Amino acid sequence: MAESSDKLYRVEYAKSGRASCKKCKESIPKDSIRMAFMVESPMFDGKIPHWYHLSCFWKVGFSIWHPDVEVEGFSELRWDDQQTIKKMAETGGRTDVSGKGQDGVGSKTEKTLIDFGAGYAKSNRSTCKSCMEKIDKGQVRLSKKVVYPDKPQLGMVDCWYHPKCFVQKREELGFRPEFSATHLMGFSVLTAEDQETLKKQLPAIKGERKRKGDEVDGIDEVTKKKSKKEKDKEIKLEKALKAQNDLIWNVKDELKKACSTNDLKELLIFNKQEVPSGESAILDRVADGMVFGALLPCEECSGQLVFKGDAYYCTGDVTAWTKCMVKTQTPNRKEWVTPKEFREISYFKKLKIKKQDRIFPPESSTPVGAAAPPSAASAPAAVHSGPPDKPLSNMKILTLGKLSQNKDEVKATIEKLGGKLTGTANKASLCISTKKEVDKLNKKMEEVKEANIRVVSEDFLQDISASTKSLQELLSTHLLSPWGAEVKVEPVEAVGPKGKSGAAPSKKSKGPVKEEGTNKSEKRMKLTLKGGAAVDPDSGLEHNAHVLEKGGKVFSATLGLVDIVKGTNSYYKLQLLEDDKESRYWIFRSWGRVGTVIGSNKLEQMPSKEDAIEHFMKLYEEKTGNAWHSKNFTKHPKKFYPLEIDYGQDEEAVKKLTVNPGTKSKLPKPVQNLIKMIFDVESMKKAMVEYEIDLQKMPLGKLSKRQIQAAYSILSEVQQALSQGSSDSHILDLSNRFYTLIPHDFGMKKPPLLNNANSVQAKVEMLDNLLDIEVAYSLLRGGSDDSSKDPIDVNYEKLKTDIKVVDKDSEEAEIIRKYVKNTHATTHNAYDLEVVDIFKIEREGESQRYKPFKQLHNRRLLWHGSRTTNFAGILSQGLRIAPPEAPVTGYMFGKGIYFADMVSKSANYCHTSQGDPIGLILLGEAALGNMYELKHARHISKLPKGKHSVKGLGKTTPDPSASITVDGVEVPLGTGISSGVNDTCLLYNEYIVYDIAQVHLKYLLKLKFNFKTSLW
């Protein structure tokens, strides 16, 4: 087979006698049929087969409805073996099925559904996966077997339901209309009374019959004739498929007798066909060519086409990043030619095959209501979110501190909502506490922080029971902690014996396979920095060795490879380590799937430094296709790409600047608090986790600016491709490139395609924030190492901005507070704004830069909001225009600096929450001059002659009669009134300048967002 498949099952003739059956543990003889269940490897980013004898496969509990669709390799079997497997699929593995008796009733063996069952609850521990209520001991319960995507090695696992709940979800669970209670495995062990009850609850559903009056003469006869014609056609096709299969296998059998493997390779090469690996694959390709003709190269990429079940698939690559997606049932061919030297072989002398086209079985798809194969999709929805009345299903809640309700009341509320109470931090999905407890950060709260569990207020419990908002929205609204990743949800059922699994974990890899939904920054890698790079702690040598540096080049590489089609999201890390004291050298490498602990590592001690360098360079070239010292890297198909990750020596500087700040600072307390807020490393990490950035493969501040700019360029290409309606393979190629450059943590999920404007816009926003975080972190790492100075003062100096606290009783403070109060838009009613502090700011060199525009008419004091993590970049470098590499999508009027005259319009860009309600917002003087007024989106790359800015006209505007002028600058602080402009797509005004020199930042406000509690 040419490429790995997404199919869950596989069948083939055993290539050797080495494989053992996972069921009976006996060896599987060579050339006998073996069937496999494909599972995610714990050792690398890919799937491996768990092989079974044909008879053992069905005993495990696997259920297949359409072997020709669900099983990889099915069509390559001999015809009789295909029929055997079809029969076993219908009967749950039995082949001794008798036909109907003379009366045609009752003598046919009924199929027992292996993936559906009935029985009595053995305890009170099981929970119905529909209503989430307990199933009492001794009560009848029904099951649907599923495969959990995060634990595929466990195989088929029972998910239990009350009979009534099962009936309600019948179609969703794939219990087909023709099935009834009698088909359930275990039905016969129920009492006669329970059997009768269940038969009434779960009967076979017959098709709706016509009313007598609806029958029209002749219709039934036509239907009968039509069905007979169709049946004859099916029989004819079946005979043709059998004849074709027999012919192919006859050719293969004769070739095996007449030719060696090398002979078969020569035949392929002579006919300009690629030679695959594996004897059986070579034989398949030669037989295909001899029967149907030699395949011509793919028209799109010139790759090799290969037969795979339902069509011929291209195995080539459209680019170095992406495989070709061509699939056809009618490939172009030429005549198969047998070389002269082969014509002396007796088989080839008498060989006469009439050239023909390959016949394919009709495209069969699983009927509506049929049981879907037990893949990731089969896992019940409750794993991720509970039913509306049980929103905390499968979640464990930890409570800390004094709450308004006592512990029993809180426990009752949580259990009513489907959750469970826990006293252990590392088992918790969520923590409910108070702001006071979070600020106090006692030992228990430290454990919560270490486990990276979100902390929410008690109000969360009240809102979730009545609110129509999603769980994630409510979590954000009530969040109290600055830390916390995605909420963990425990699997819905105890899916196997504790501490055991179907696959033994490698001694080299650390920990079990990560569960989907596990929090994304839970595992923190401590990097020991020596010399030019961080020593990987998994090597066990972080305290004894360092990464070799020679000729200015650090012998450490982090590589990435993403293939959305295959679902892989892989990394490979390579390091050459040198002992700190002795002349000893090691090569350390680790590999796996990004964002999970799937993977392994290897440490090899080398005889000498020269051997170590040679081995390192050999491995690097093997993985990337490029020489280590090559100046211009060229990406090769199916090869890794290097990530420019800067493991500089500045990590200790960051630690120094974040330990005990404020003890020696002489700055005013509000300014000290502002600096701490701007340089808060935890907030930066939280922002990266929100964007699904992998903090292990791309630690904070480590991705280079150049690589971020390259990612912008890819997004620009995506936008262009979408607007031009480019091919799917082009979009796929760009998506693969983007995710390789910027490592994302998708767990076990496939990386999503960047195939719409919204996904591009979201990634642009992510890169904007990454750039600012990169600036903030660079500032933290660089500059003065004067230990006599307070860390806050050191960071303050790096901003190169004079920051003064504005007296709350001053006139300018009064004007600003009035501006905040009056311009809060009526539609932005989820919160009120409270001014905490006002700072007057003067960026170094900005007033000089602004001087030419000081004389321009129409200067206004306007709002600009942004995330707290962006302010180190804003204050140190000013408000900037998106880089040239960035796509124009997401910018309503092109790339520029955007302002608003309504405070809440800008405040929405602060991205605060109830748990993190403090935001920062700017007031900047913008030299607008002559404004180009627009009502709808338009990409502006160059302003019309005589225009200095753009104004997006909104339906609401501050009352112009209430505006005031301060030092020649208009302050539009009137309350919102109708602008009289109705045919506009904007609710509120927007102002855009396209030259950074037209902006002079004046004030920075610290605002508290007082979120209003939901009333519904």
From Swiss-Prot:
Report the residue ranges that make up the PARP catalytic domain in this protein. Answer: 790-1016
> Which reactions does this protein catalyse?
NAD(+) + (ADP-D-ribosyl)n-acceptor = nicotinamide + (ADP-D-ribosyl)n+1-acceptor + H(+); L-seryl-[protein] + NAD(+) = O-(ADP-D-ribosyl)-L-seryl-[protein] + nicotinamide + H(+); L-aspartyl-[protein] + NAD(+) = 4-O-(ADP-D-ribosyl)-L-aspartyl-[protein] + nicotinamide; L-glutamyl-[protein] + NAD(+) = 5-O-(ADP-D-ribosyl)-L-glutamyl-[protein] + nicotinamide
Task: Please name the GO terms of the biological process aspect recorded for this protein, alphabetically.
Answer: apoptotic process; ATP generation from poly-ADP-D-ribose; decidualization; DNA ADP-ribosylation; DNA damage response; double-strand break repair; innate immune response; negative regulation of innate immune response
Q: Enumerate the residue ranges of region (Disordered).
A: 360-390, 494-523
**Sequence positions that bind NAD(+):** H864, G865, S866, G873, R880, S906
> Which Enzyme Commission numbers does its entry carry?
2.4.2.30, 2.4.2.-
Which ranges carry the PADR1 zinc-binding domain? 228-362
User: Could you say which residues are annotated as the site Cleavage?
Assistant: D217, G218
Kindly list the positions annotated as binding Zn(2+) 2: C128, C131, H162, C165
GO CC annotations?
chromatin; cytosol; nuclear envelope; nuclear replication fork; nucleolus; nucleus; site of DNA damage; site of double-strand break
Domain (BRCT): residue spans on this chain: 387-478
Composition bias, Low complexity: 365-386, 496-506
Q: How is its activity regulated?
A: ADP-ribosyltransferase activity is regulated via an allosteric activation mechanism. In absence of activation signal, PARP1 is autoinhibited by the PARP alpha-helical domain (also named HD region), which prevents effective NAD(+)-binding. Activity is highly stimulated by signals, such as DNA strand breaks. Binding to damaged DNA unfolds the PARP alpha-helical domain, relieving autoinhibition.
Q: Which residues carry this modification: N-acetylalanine?
A: A2
N6-acetyllysine is found on K100, K108, K134, K602, K623
Matching InterPro entries? ARTD/PARP, BRCT_dom, BRCT_dom_sf, PADR1_C_dom_sf, PARP, PARP1-like_PADR1_N, PARP1-like_PADR1_Zn_ribbon, Poly(ADP-ribose)pol_cat_dom
Q: Which SUPFAM superfamilies match?
A: ADP-ribosylation, BRCT domain, Domain of poly(ADP-ribose) polymerase, Glucocorticoid receptor-like (DNA-binding domain), WGR domain-like
Q: Of which family is this protein a member?
A: Belongs to the ARTD/PARP family.
According to UniProt, the name of this protein is Poly [ADP-ribose] polymerase 1
Q: Which organism is it from?
A: Bos taurus
